[in-house]
Amino acid sequence: MFVYHKKINKNSEKTKKYRPQMTEGNILKGFILFAIPLFLGSLFQQLYGTVDLLFVGNILGKNDAAAVGSSSILVTCLIGLFTGISVGAGVVTAQYWGAKDTDNVTHSIENSLFIGLIGGIILTGIGEVLCGPALHWLSVPETIMDHAVCYLRIYLLSILPMIMYNMSAAILRAIGDSKTPFLVLASGGILNVCMDALFIGFLDMSVAGAAFATMVSQMFTAVVLTVFLVQREKLLGNKWKIDLNLITKVITVGVPLGIQSMILTLSNLVVQYYINGFGENDIAAFTIYFKVENLIYLPIMAFGQAMVTFVGQNIGAGKVDRIKKAALECNFFSAVVIGVLSGILLLSGRGILKLFCSDEEVIAEGLKIIHISFPFYFICAILEVTGSILRGAGKTLQSMVIVIVSLCGFRIIILKVLLIRSHTIQAVATVYPLSWFCAAVLFVGCWMYYKNKMDFYGAF
């Protein structure tokens, strides 16, 4: 990876503006304070899908809930590449910020937004063309196919707003602002609830209403956050310069993460394919479970995002020892927090599942999944934080290989083996903790290998 140190007049106002915020002070305190808005922001982001499911599952029924769950994962797959590229933009920007290179911070923001805009337009077109065949490939039951196609075609219009929001949020986090994305998402979450009530409850628009509600909310958050970023960094008065060298740096870091995200999503599509073969109750149970597990996974993601920014800024500032210390403190803290949280949710699983669906058969299947996976989520915290150290330092290729091997290849192989032995929903659920353990071992091993090697840190 590249670390860039540029001599700048430390007394200049612009340099003060770009003073890094995670390169000094108490490590764990700074990590926690930065991660809290990230968690809250991700929580509100999940409201888009969760509120849709609450309205769909309780007002329209389990078939429509299954239609929403079996189709929305395709959007995740499509935007996976640009999710990684947005992280790459954040890593590059964070290192420039840590090095106090204000000119390249500005250029990084401009070129990252350009990448997001073009990519979002292209992916929306691809999604609209492929959505029908993709749902058939997933073996979505014919009883819910029409509703799944209807939901997906409208939902695909959210791709461009999602990408632009993710890009803007990643950049703001890179320069130390995790609060603004949260506030924008909170507003978008409230808007989403209102739109669901209008489109589903009042106008009776079925799954189309759920998709429209999400689209409107995503557009709102994307426009507000992107405009805020452009105005805050005073980009409107600048002549934007498309810098192919900088775009290459962002893509070099981001594409492996994007490929990682896409392949991971594809492996989840394979799992979804097997889930779809169990029937409507199990499809609905897994759809609801994936919403409930977000209460655990969202703080894990927040810890990982905070670590990426922390590592990026400290590498830019040349403070390697802080990274080594953070690896121990933040991993321990994250594992303890997630262990306690998963235990609480495990004890209250039935009540939480009932919020999403009143069907007792679906709840019973959901509880089977929870009892298998929730006790092991602390492993997921360790793999995410350790992997984020590597990603923040630019070792994105290594991260990609580990994820492909453990969370994709190993997961699918184990799934097939377990289903041969026992064709049950419990067999499907078991693949998750097993693959987490495999990934955690590989990530920790990779970190131990690189942490004392100088080639862990490169130069722009």
Where are these regions (language model features)?
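Transmembrane helical elements of multi-pass membrane transporters/channels
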Residues: 33-52, 154, 165, 188, ...
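Short runs within selected transmembrane alpha-helices of multi-pass transporters and secretion channels
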Residues: 86, 154-173, 181-189, 210-225, ...
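Small-residue-rich hydrophobic transmembrane alpha-helices
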Residues: 65-125, 162-181, 285-349, 380-403
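Interfacial/gating helices of multi-pass transporter permease domains
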Residues: 56-76, 142-150, 207-208, 249-253, ...
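Helix-terminus/linker motif at the lipid-water interface of multi-pass membrane proteins
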Residues: 47-66, 135-142, 198-205, 262-295, ...
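Short alpha-helical transmembrane segments in multi-pass integral membrane proteins
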Residues: 1-35, 93-158, 202-255, 311-376, ...
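Alpha-helical transmembrane segments of multipass membrane proteins
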Residues: 50, 125, 167-171, 190-198, ...
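Residue-level signal for short hydrophobic patches within transmembrane helices
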Residues: 24, 28-47, 51, 74-81, ...
